[in-house]
A protein has these predicted regions:
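Short, glycine/small-residue-enriched coil/turn segments at secondary-structure junctions
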Residues: 28-30, 61-74, 202-214
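Acidic-aromatic/histidine active-site loop/patch
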Residues: 160-213, 218-224
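Short amphipathic alpha-helical surface micro-motifs
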Residues: 11-22, 27, 36, 71, ...
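Flexible loop/turn segments at secondary-structure boundaries
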Residues: 45, 97, 172-173, 225
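Histidine- and aromatic-enriched segments that form or immediately flank copper-ligand environments
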Residues: 34-155
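Extracytoplasmic/periplasmic copper-protein system
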Residues: 3-29, 143-171
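A general structural signal for short secondary-structure junctions and capping/turn motifs
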Residues: 25-29, 79, 138-140, 154-157, ...
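Transition-metal
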Residues: 1-51, 73, 77
Length: 225
């Protein structure tokens, strides 16, 4: 346990104020959607047939789509099988302070072999994504990201959902993910380009839309480029 001198009173007071404000706004959930996912090294097949060594949620890139309806509680248990600590940050989602996934600020990092359960009621419908906030330039680039969809309370008038997750991959001479995740060149040029572009982890495919069909296209761009 931290000693009194390790605790930042201002930070603790701010966290308590944010948590209290969130609690005042949060209604009783109508139901709970539960998921259990694992972050671990994996191999996925790229569109050219190459087996790419990645880090992934549930052995897929992008990770699983998590879905919850507005008013429901989302509960996600993350188990860490990576060789380094990790967390989940819910990008663009208004969550309680303790659920924000910022290591050393809102939670301690999840150590290799450990688990952590995130639990909150989303306040807004929409398309969001989740990813680590520990060594993000590396862990996201290795493939750790997924989609969170918060559906409206009542169905909207469209025919079907299409989710496109766009990413670029910087590969080394061996055809694997380049381990130089942040270089001076990247910093000087405000980013970098990858050699391979994927949509949902594969080459872009033609989407057929029938006359009169209404599509809800959900775009997520975790690309580091």
């Amino acid at each position: 346990a931290p000693s009194p001198r390790d605790v930042d009173p201002q930070r603790e007071a701010c966290a308590a104020e944010v948590a209290a404000a969130y609690a005042r706004e949060s209604p009783t959930p109508t139901a709970t959607r539960r998921y259990a996912i694992t972050a671990a090294p994996a191999e996925v097949q790229q569109f050219d047939g190459r087996l790419l060594k990645v880090w992934a949620y549930d052995e897929r890139v992008p990770g699983p789509i998590l879905r919850v309806r507005l008013g429901e509680e989302l509960e996600v248990k993350l188990t860490n099988r990576l060789p380094q600590p990790t967390t989940i940050h819910w990008h663009g989602v208004r969550v309680p302070n303790a659920m924000d996934g910022v290591p050393g600020v809102t939670q301690e990092p999840i150590a290799p072999g450990a688990s952590y359960t995130y639990r909150f009621v989303p306040k807004d419908a929409g398309t969001f994504w989740f990813h680590p906030h520990v060594r993000g330039a590396e862990q996201i680039e290795r493939g750790l990201y997924g989609v969170l969809i918060v559906d409206d309370r009542e169905p909207l008038p469209y025919s079907r959902d299409e989710v496109w997750v766009l990413d670029d991959w910087r590969l080394g001479p061996d055809g694997q993910v380049d381990p130089r995740f942040v270089t001076r060149h990247d910093l000087a040029h405000d980013g970098r380009w990858g050699q391979a572009i994927t949509v949902n982890g594969d080459a872009a495919k033609e989407m057929v839309v029938r006359p009169g069909e209404r599509i809800r296209l959900r775009l997520v761009n975790p690309s580091n480029g």
